Amino acid sequence: MSKLYVGSEVGQLRRVLLNRPERALTHLTPSNCHELLFDDVLLVEAAGKEHDAFADTLRQQGVEVLLLHDLMVDTLAVPEAKQWLLDVQISDFRYGPIFARDLRRYLSEMDNEHLATILLGGLAYSELPIQSASMLPRMKQPLDFVIEPLPNHLFTRDTSCWVYGGVSLNPMMKPARQRETNHLRAIYQWHPIFAGQDFIKYFGNEDLHYDNANIEGGDVLVIGKGAVLIGMSERTTPQGVENLAANLFRHGQAKEVIAIELPKHRSCMHLDTVMTHMDVDTFSVYPEIMRKDLHTWRLTPKGNGEMQVEALHNYLHAIERALGLNHLNIITTGGDSYEAEREQWNDANNVLTVKPGVVIGYERNVYTNEKYDKAGIEVLTIPGNELGRGRGGARCMSCPIERDDI
C-alpha cells in the first residue's frame, strides 16, 4: 500500500507532483517576466513538450506522476474547498469588498476545469466579462491582471516539501509566489488522495502572516536517516529553518537539521541549484559552495521543545556524520571554469534522483553529464532548451510525495 512519506533524496521514487507549463507561461512578456521571477519568456508549446518528455521518463521508471492542474480540478469539486480557495485568493483586502464579491460570484459559477486554469494561469481585465461598481477595475488597464498568473508553479518543489512523515506548506519569500501555497493547502486538505490520510503538516498551514519565516522546498534536502539539509539562500531565512526544525523535532520526525548559509545571488537561488544527492554517498556540488567560509550549523532537539544550535566548520563532514559514512563522493560541475559556470546556470547540478545512482537531467549539460557517467551515475537525459530558461531543472520541477528510505 502506498503512503505519504519521503524518507530520502535517493531511495526509490514512487510518486511525484508535477505541473505542466501552460496558460501561465502565455502571460509572460519581456515587460513583466522579471516581476514574475523569470529571466526570459519561453516558447510555451515547446516547453510543454519538454515537460511531457520529463513526465514520460518518470513513468518509464515506474514513478506515478500527479499533475497539479488535475489535482486542482478534483479539489475544486469539493464545495468546501472551492469556497475556501475563493475566499482566500479573492479576499476583500486584495480587491476591496465590492469587487471581491463580484469576482468571487463570477468565478464560483465557472466549471472546475476552467476555474483551475484561471487560478493557476491568471486572468486579465480584458478577459473579464463582468461589470462592477467598484473603483478598482475602472482604474486598471485592459492588460493588467485581475488574477496574476503563477508561472513559477512549474517548480512544484518549492511550494511544499515532504519531509519523512509530513509536509511543510512553505511561506514563500517573493510576493509573486505566495498564492501558490494556498493551492497546495487546499489539495492536501480536501483532495481524495490526501483527505483523511495520516500525515503531519509541520509548518505553513495556518492562516497567519509568517513575517520573515520563509522557506522554500528547493533549499530542503531530505538526506535520510533522520537528517535534513537546508540551505539558507536568498529565498529561505534562518527564521524559516528554525521554525521548520522545531516542528520536525516536536513530531519526532528528524534527529538533526544541518543548515548552510549560501551566497545570496541568483545562481544560488536554492540549495538544489548548486547541490543534489545522487547516490547514498554521492553528491553533485558546484565548486563555489565548497568554500570554507560558508557558515554551517547543526540543529538538534534538546528536550522540552528547545533546540541546540552548534556551529560547524564543514558541512560535508556534517553530512558524513549524519549518514554514518567515512567519505562522500563529490562530483563537481563539468568542463573548464567557463563551461562549469554556464552549465550550473543551466541546472547541471539540479538533477532528480529516481533511485540510487540514477538521475534525470537536461541533455544540454554535456560536460557535467559526462562526469556523472564516469563516476558511475546513470543520467536519463531530457530536453530542456525552453524549460531551462526558467532557471530550474528536474529537481526544481518535481515534488516527491512518496519515496523510500535509504
From Swiss-Prot:
Residues in coiled coil: none
Record-linked InterPro entries: Arg_deiminase
Biological process (GO), any one: arginine deiminase pathway
Catalytic activity: L-arginine + H2O = L-citrulline + NH4(+)
Listed GO MF terms: arginine deiminase activity
Taxonomic superkingdom: Bacteria
Entry keyword Hydrolase: yes
Keyword Cytoplasm set for record: yes
Places the protein is found: Cytoplasm
Assigned GO CC terms: cytoplasm
Xref: NCBIfam families: arcA, PRK01388.1
Protein name, per record: Arginine deiminase
